[in-house]
Amino acid sequence: MSKLIIMKLGGSAISDKSRPLSYREDWVRKLGTLLNREFRSGSRFILIHGGGSFAHPIALAYGLSRYRDYDQLIGVSLTSAVLNYLSMKITLTLASIGLSIYPLRTGSIYVIKDGKPHLLIGPTHLMELIERNTIPMLYGDVVISDDGFSIISGDDIMLDLGSRLRPSASIFLTDVPGILDANGNIIRRLTRSSVINERDVHHIDVTGGS
């Protein structure tokens, strides 16, 4: 089989988080040009994108990092809608330069069960889409969970699909040059001692990812 690459488009790369509903079309278009070249050379992709400035303001306003009551359901609806809208914008941008993106609504194929992501379709379905020369694309989303609703981040999906599909590479695209330590220096090699404990992180992302 062709080389499979799972790639995450970080929310901070595809949007400006300081401006709600901002979309960096030029950045996505430039990335698409590179992907198109690699696709024509035989590489195959699964794309996953974050919520960026589309989902985060709503998720924060409605406290969707933890589902508690009925009043949050409007937030669930709005967050799901804007994420689908962002996915559509990315799809249209990439399709305009020749990439056959096949968007999948994450909330329709994933749930959170026992605190962990649970894929409702077999990974074979994703592979069949790839074999038909399309590029499946998922995104961080609000999904059904044991408690009602929870947010599954793009990072959660990357980890789950990476363990299921064993790609040749998993790539995370962000607006910073790499994984940074507490002083802002790039961590060239990850070890147990260099992994940041969440207790030491002062700015936790409300959706669990970017």
Range-by-range predicted roles:
Residues 61-141:
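Ligand-binding beta-strand-loop-alpha-helix segment within the catalytic cores
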Residues 13-15, 52-56, 109-112, 143-145, ...:
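Short, active-site-adjacent cap segments at secondary-structure transitions
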Residues 6-10, 48-49, 104-105, 137-139, ...:
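Short beta-strand segments
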Residues 1-46:
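N-terminal glycine-/serine-/threonine-rich phosphate-binding loop
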Residues 57-68, 185-196:
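Short, flexible, mixed-charge acidic loops at enzyme active sites
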Residues 163-189:
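Acidic, metal-binding active-site segment of PIN/NYN-like and related structure-specific nucleases
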Residues 29, 117-128, 144, 150-161:
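Active-site glycine-rich loop that binds ribose-phosphate moieties when present
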Residues 27, 31, 77-91, 149-151, ...:
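Polyanion-binding loop/helix "lid" in catalytic or ligand-binding cores
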